[in-house]
Amino acid sequence: MNEVYEQTCFQIISFAGTAKSCFLEAIECAKAKGDPSELLKEGNDAIQQASISHQKALTLDANGELEVVLLLIHAETILSSAETVRDLSQTIID
């Protein structure tokens, strides 16, 4: 596994995990009658960074520089989960 690929996957995992945590905290904040806007912004910023890293992985794949291995699948699963929680958090908070 090449180093750029590994680093890219770990960036996706890290940013997506941060985003998911922020969105879940925003839900709890709203339930407690607080203002979740800063947590939502932080989550959206993190998910944007995860998406940029994911695009980098897709570019590596398109250039034939990437072998699909479990690490990328794991990273994509975490990113997908974070996107789902983001969407649900808006519904729950609104």
Spans of features found by a protein language model:
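Terminal alpha-helical segments
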Residues: 1-94
